[in-house]
Amino acid sequence: LIPDPVFEQELISLGYDNVIDGGVLTANISSVDTLDIPLFSGISDLTGIEDFTALTYLHVPIGVTNPIISLDVTQNTALTELYLSGVNSSQLTSIDITQNTALEYFHCSSHQLTSLDVSQNTALIELRCAGNQLTRLDVSQNTALTELLCGGSQLTSLDVSQNTALTELDCRYNQLTS
């Protein structure tokens, strides 16, 4: 099911579909491992992304030009790289990545996220979640992290004592007291 005709048109442009009819054959997308959504495509709903079960790389710019307010990647368990670029007033308020345990690179900066659970993402190497509304961020299970960018949120504390591999940390512009 692909309810957004703009998303389906993008899939047609990529050769995964051939007519706008609200769906795409699973056989056409079951082996797709990379999907890069264009910035100015106008996609507002990515329902159907869950059927791209082989995806290891997904890039979605979200904002005025792609006004996506929710995204379900819980079925995309092969993802190792997920880039949700917040541009032009993104309204994305939540994202569940607890099922994406293979994730190594996750960028979700410049959205309206109020919480982010990365406790199941123990393979994370790079986490960029700056410019959100996060009040809490627990990275104690993410011991492989080499880069953590979480500035510009509402964090009052941040414990990186378990993150001994960190080579880059930017937590400026929060309300950190510990």
Where are these regions (language model features)?
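N-terminal capping/linker segments that flank leucine-rich repeat
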Residues: L1-V64, I68-T77, E81, Q99-T101, ...
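Canonical leucine-rich repeat
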Residues: L46-I49, L58, L71, L92-I95, ...
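Consensus "Asn ladder" position of solenoid repeat domains
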Residues: N66, V87-S90, H111, N132, ...
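Short hydrophobic transmembrane-like helices used for membrane targeting/insertion
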Residues: I68, V87, I95-I97, I125
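Consensus positions within tandem repeat domains that build extended binding/scaffold surfaces
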Residues: Y83, Y105-H107, E126-R128, E147-L149, ...
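Serine residues within intrinsically disordered or low-complexity segments
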Residues: S109-S110, S115, S119, S140, ...
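Low-complexity/repetitive intrinsically disordered segments
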Residues: V160, T167-S178
